[in-house]
Swiss-Prot record:
<keyword id="KW-0819">tRNA processing</keyword>
<comment type="subunit">
    <text>Homodimer.</text>
</comment>
<keyword id="KW-0694">RNA-binding</keyword>
<feature type="binding site">
    <location>
        <position position="149"/>
    </location>
    <ligand>
        <name>[4Fe-4S] cluster</name>
    </ligand>
</feature>
<dbReference type="GO" id="GO:0000287">
    <property type="term" value="F:magnesium ion binding"/>
</dbReference>
<comment type="similarity">
    <text>Belongs to the TtcA family.</text>
</comment>
<keyword id="KW-0479">Metal-binding</keyword>
<dbReference type="GO" id="GO:0005737">
    <property type="term" value="C:cytoplasm"/>
</dbReference>
<dbReference type="GO" id="GO:0034227">
    <property type="term" value="P:tRNA thio-modification"/>
</dbReference>
<keyword id="KW-0820">tRNA-binding</keyword>
<dbReference type="GO" id="GO:0005524">
    <property type="term" value="F:ATP binding"/>
</dbReference>
<keyword id="KW-0004">4Fe-4S</keyword>
<dbReference type="GO" id="GO:0051539">
    <property type="term" value="F:4 iron, 4 sulfur cluster binding"/>
</dbReference>
<comment type="function">
    <text>Catalyzes the ATP-dependent 2-thiolation of cytidine in position 32 of tRNA, to form 2-thiocytidine (s(2)C32). The sulfur atoms are provided by the cysteine/cysteine desulfurase (IscS) system.</text>
</comment>
<keyword id="KW-0460">Magnesium</keyword>
<keyword id="KW-0808">Transferase</keyword>
<dbReference type="Pfam" id="PF01171">
    <property type="entry name" value="ATP_bind_3"/>
</dbReference>
């Protein structure tokens, strides 16, 4: 593992946190109205992302005292942003935890091996580069024209679990965001026939690791703006990202279309993931339908058999009794 000698935490965030006050020092000019607005919006964006990540960590107890968090860094916008924000939060956190960045070099042709080591050394973050030629394995085993995501993901997952053990990491942080979670929900509904999303925190399938997703509440569009603002040295994925006709790409386009044409719909979908009512679904493993009997006592979650659901009227503000909205989606500054 490489441990740089410098120990600066987050790379200088002055551009993001710049105030809109007059900066007319000697030889400098005041900000124009447009520049003031841009600085203000950039500052709001940064604070919003930090707040959302902090809330997700708190809501799901993602990081605890003494944790060693292995931040999986792919070189994409999401993982860069996750590392950047976690470093920032660590400065203010009431607990102590360590961060180590890990990149899996899958030996894709043209992969710029120098980019991540240089970046991580510059910002003073300990890191480990794991070299494994999964690219050749995937290209050999997956027929031409078929998507490589499934096999690539399985290989990558196994390697990262092993590396986490070798490094003594107690948490594995992945850069999936709100849109990824919703896309997974729709993919499972449309093509898998099940109500299954992507949890903010889970035990790994090998039973040895806890995986966390600190960006769970963050919109992808915000991460795109943030990455551009921070000028992260983005490394494009030419193995899976360029594959045409991916079902996930269809879900992404669908969600963005809904978000544009029906304001609030996507926020409500996301909120629904934390407002599950098993008694009003059809899974007999989640609710004892077979043994259900009339108790003679009123039940606020009971079926209003002959009434229309409040939301059926088109009133998006209606909330079923007992529903627990995710407060983070009620943004006041979006």
């Amino acid at each position: 593992m490489n441990a740089p000698h410098t120990h600066d935490t987050v790379a200088d965030g002055a551009a993001i946190e710049a105030t809109v006050a007059d900066i007319a020092d000697t030889g400098r000019r005041a900000l124009t109205r447009r520049e003031q607005k841009e600085a203000y919006e950039n500052n709001k964006l940064f604070k919003r992302i930090v707040r959302q990540v902090g809330q997700a960590i708190g809501d799901y107890n993602m990081i605890e005292q003494g944790d060693k968090v292995m931040v999986c860094l792919s070189g994409g916008k999401d993982s860069y942003a996750m590392l950047d924000v976690l470093l920032r939060l660590r400065e203010r956190a009431p607990i102590d935890f360590d961060i180590v960045a890990v990149n899996l070099d899958q030996k894709q042709p043209g992969f710029p091996e120098h980019v991540l080591p240089e970046y991580l050394t510059q910002i003073g973050v300990p890191f480990h580069i794991e070299n494994q030629d999964t690219y050749s394995i995937v290209k050999r085993l997956v027929p031409e024209g078929k998507t490589t995501c499934s096999l690539c993901s399985r290989l990558r997952r196994g390697i990262l679990y092993r590396v986490a053990g070798e490094l003594g990491a107690t948490k594995i942080a992945l850069g999936h965001h709100r849109d990824d979670i919703l896309q997974t929900l729709l993919l499972n509904m449309f093509y898998g026939g099940k109500l299954k999303g992507m949890p903010p925190k889970l035990q790994s399938d090998d039973g040895r690791n806890v995986v966390i997703r600190p960006l769970a509440y963050v919109k992808e569009t915000d991460l795109e703006k943030f990455a551009e603002l921070r000028e992260f040295p983005i490394i494009p994925c030419n193995l899976c990202g360029s594959q045409p006709n991916l079902k996930r790409a269809e879900m992404k386009a669908l969600i963005r279309d809904w978000d544009k044409r029906f304001p609030g719909r996507v926020d409500n979908m996301f909120s629904a993931l934390a407002n599950v009512v098993p008694s009003h679904l059809m899974d007999t493993t989640q609710f004892p339908f077979a043994s259900l009997r009339a108790t003679g006592q009123a039940d606020p979650q009971g079926d209003i058999a002959f009434d229309e659901e409040p939301c059926a009227s088109g009133d998006d503000t209606a909330t079923r009794d007992g529903a627990r909205p995710i407060s983070i989606v009620q943004f006041d500054d979006l």
